[in-house]
Amino acid sequence: DKAIEIAETLAKIKNQAMHEIVAHYYCEISHFYLDNKDYERSLLFLKRAIAQDKQCVRAELALANLYSAQGSYKLAIKSLKKVYAKNPEFLYEILTTLSFCYEQSGDEKGLAEFVESCLVDNPQTSLYLFLYDYMQKTGANKISKQRLHEHVLKYPSIVGLNTFVKLVEKEGAWPGDDATTILSSLEKIISSLPRYKCNECGLAGKMLYWQCPRCKSWGETKPVYALNERG
């Protein structure tokens, strides 16, 4: 109750930076209710968070996860697409849940079409390979190997190359021992790379913190997949 009172007081301050902080407070309150299985109040405070900050990725992600857990897959897909629209850097954060929701909705082609549209502005190799692998599994319109090779050469990266070698090995087109050695080396390099970085103070690591533990800023920690994609 005290947390809600503080958030409501701060919400009255007409300042965008403050509204962003209030949105995070509402997300914290929503998480508390979610832990106590009070889904109605959890949903209420997520909507309040978005009302405070329409660009709040955290609230939209939580909303998608809540919808998915309740079996409202189409609503979850809608929220996940909003995450990408608000901040394309979070694309890889939503792909697993998005795949699940599309599959549960019986719309396997829908995911392929969405990823294809994302590739226009984000031509990362690992995203392209995700699409290739997904199409192989689902039997959707498949990408030719020639087109795949051309993309890997055009957009070289450590992460993309690692995924590409895995696919080639799985298809039996590469001697096992050679592929294993290359994969082992690539994965050691990738494991040393940070997954997230605070834009405010530069703190980098493997965990996504909505409030940076070093500088205490809210919402400044972002995925660095794009950075790792540059090779």
Sequence positions of predicted segments:
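TPR/Sel1-like alpha-solenoid repeat signature
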Residues: Y26-Y33, F45, E60-Y67, S79
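Cys/His-clustered metal-coordination modules, chiefly Zn-binding fingers
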Residues: L153-G231
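Structural register within alpha-helical repeat arrays
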Residues: V22, E28-I29, L63, T97-L98, ...
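Start-of-helix register in tetratricopeptide repeats
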Residues: A17-H24, R41, R58, Y92-E93, ...
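Alpha-helical repeat scaffolds
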Residues: K2-L10, Y39-R48, Y73-Y84, D107-D121, ...
